[in-house]
Amino acid sequence: MPKMKSHRGACKRFKATASGKIKRERMNGSHNLEKKNRKRTRRLHQSTMLDNATKEKQIKRMILA
């Protein structure tokens, strides 16, 4: 049986922290930033943790395979 391969798209979008949580980037922070106010663009450049437990289990399976 061959080794399981990790999902390369998920590996580029999500990172696992040392405690096992999943870190992700926020959407809408890459272009059309002149329309968005400064407070919003600062918030969009911060990374955040994934809070959906069912998605977290799926993503862990994809990136830690």
From Swiss-Prot:
GO CC annotations on file: cytosolic large ribosomal subunit
Segments of this protein annotated with the region Disordered: 28-53
GO biological process: translation
Key words, A-Z: Ribonucleoprotein, Ribosomal protein
Gene Ontology MF: a single term: structural constituent of ribosome
Annotated Pfam families: Ribosomal_L35p (PF01632)
Compositional bias of kind Basic residues: 36-45
Superkingdom: Bacteria
Family note: Belongs to the bacterial ribosomal protein bL35 family.
Name used for this protein in its record: Large ribosomal subunit protein bL35
Protein encoded by which gene: rpmI
